[in-house]
Amino acid sequence: MEAISIFSDYQLQFFKRIGMKPKPIETLDDVSDVMKACSNVFSFENLDIVSNSCEPLNKDVLIKQVICNNQGGLCYKINTLLYHFLLEFGFKIHIIRGSVENQETHSDWNIPTGHMINIINFENRLYVVDVAFGCNLSLRPIPITDDGSEVVESCTGLYRVRKVENCVSGKYNYTHILEHRKLDSFLIESGKTWVTGYAFDPLLIVDNNNNNEKTTHQTLVQQLVIDDPTKEFSTKPLATKIVNDGSSFSIATLTANSFTLTDCKTGQKTKTNFDNDKSSFEQFNQHLISIFNLPPLKTIPPIFLN
């Protein structure tokens, strides 16, 4: 007689994709294990946008793209897949939309309401569960507090959430911000200062039951990224993820012009610049395959032809 699995087909697909042996996911430590496994596999990347191959999104499309076809994605893809995974394990979880602060100037907001975040309610406390904020990854749930007194540490830095007043982005008045800073071992002093990552309201829940791919929040956020006047994510290819060489963690970052490894502990960088001709596209694709385990781009984005 064939054994009856206690896991759904989607749960088994997700476990396989993140390279994790199936097990019940019941505690915050279990969620942390899943978040770490996600960071080992999922790349934060915008390749479908820069190659003009986007399609309307719902759960089935996301499974096809990220789980079956081994793609990565931005927050609206990866965090949504984690949402469905944890929801099937019975977690009280919902998705919200927040606004990311410009991580270079820290003076304005990038794409208001353009960041999709998971919030879980565990034992009557709220936590941020985000596996797709670039490589600023806490790798475990972050408690939502009033004063930011509970700090979570990962290989990428320190994270906290605190309550704020008069934090306005677009038409929204947010109630909380996520802040992050680098580890004490970081060699660049400015990196050890707390900065805002993004602002949000943990109770501003979006409807995630809509399966009409043309009108889902995932499709709407994707269109916000495409239409963003700064074109930060729509014209410049980017892939980034945490890599572990067995002794230390680094952040791998691939752009049209270069590949960079940044040591998470010290901030020291090793950078390889690509040739300034059409062979840079070939070098880009080689790194996509060898470092990020992503399928190569089939069409050349305009940035490589300039």
UniProtKB/Swiss-Prot annotation:
Reactions this protein catalyses: an arylamine + acetyl-CoA = an N-acetylarylamine + CoA
Alphabetized UniProt keyword annotations: Acyltransferase, Transferase
EC number(s) from the headed UniProt entry: 2.3.1.5
Class of enzymatic activity (EC top level): transferase
Active site: 75, 115, 130
Single GO molecular function: arylamine N-acetyltransferase activity
Sequence similarity: Belongs to the arylamine N-acetyltransferase family.
Protein's name in the database: Probable arylamine N-acetyltransferase 3
